[in-house]
Amino acid sequence: MSKKIETSAITAGRPAVTPDAPLNPSIDLTSTFHSGGPIGYGRYGNQTWTSLEDAISELEGGQTLTFSSGMAAISAVFSILPIGAPIVASNQGYSGVMSLLNSFHTSGRLEVRFVDVVNTQEVIDAMKGAALVWLESPTNPCLDVADLPALISAAKKLGIGVAVDNTFATPLVQNPLAMGADIVMHSVTKFLSGHSDVLMGSLSISDPALFKRLHDSRSFNGSIPGPFEAWLALRGLRTFPLRFNKSQESAKEL
């Protein structure tokens, strides 16, 4: 029997069940590890991050990497694209992303084709020759909703990668990886962590080779989360379904 997402939020990312084992993961405040293991150094991994990453993976699917912020996660995706690569992106969305994409477009780092994500055909028409389709749905703050299944399907037929910012919808509402997306991004700062005391981002990735490239990007750029922040985010994740459902009820009432 598959677990409900509410159950996964409570149970995922916990230590193995053995006699007298702690229920919660430890906060591993270390920069250095003994040799011979898979981590090697504090910029490459940390057991506290791993617990949070395992939990997000159980909600979103794929393999997950956590980052020092949502913008760090987004920047990692763009960092693996060639200079001048064409991408398709919404003409309105999170202000940090819009500023970054406009900067990339002006400098020639990327060729950004800005589109209205509500206009499905406009987005599809802009895809030809693109290296990536970056989708935010619902958008922040205007709440524009893209037809993700149609857009992801169209991109896949053209062999184009798709990344979806799932921060506002969350895995309680939609699972873009299950629709065929390659990457799902979260500003963990917002709904997943939910207590306004953590800056963090995450990427959930469907392909192991792509996961490795993004893992290397994080390691080399140093855009890693702190172990205490990862522990706080995991604690916040335990109540995520309750908080999200209550916020929807409040929004309907208002």
Where are the model-predicted features located?
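Conserved N-terminal alpha-helix of the aminotransferase class I/II PLP-enzyme fold
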Residues: 25-80, 96-105
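Short clusters of hydrophobic/aromatic residues that line enzyme substrate/ligand-binding pockets
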Residues: 10, 41, 192
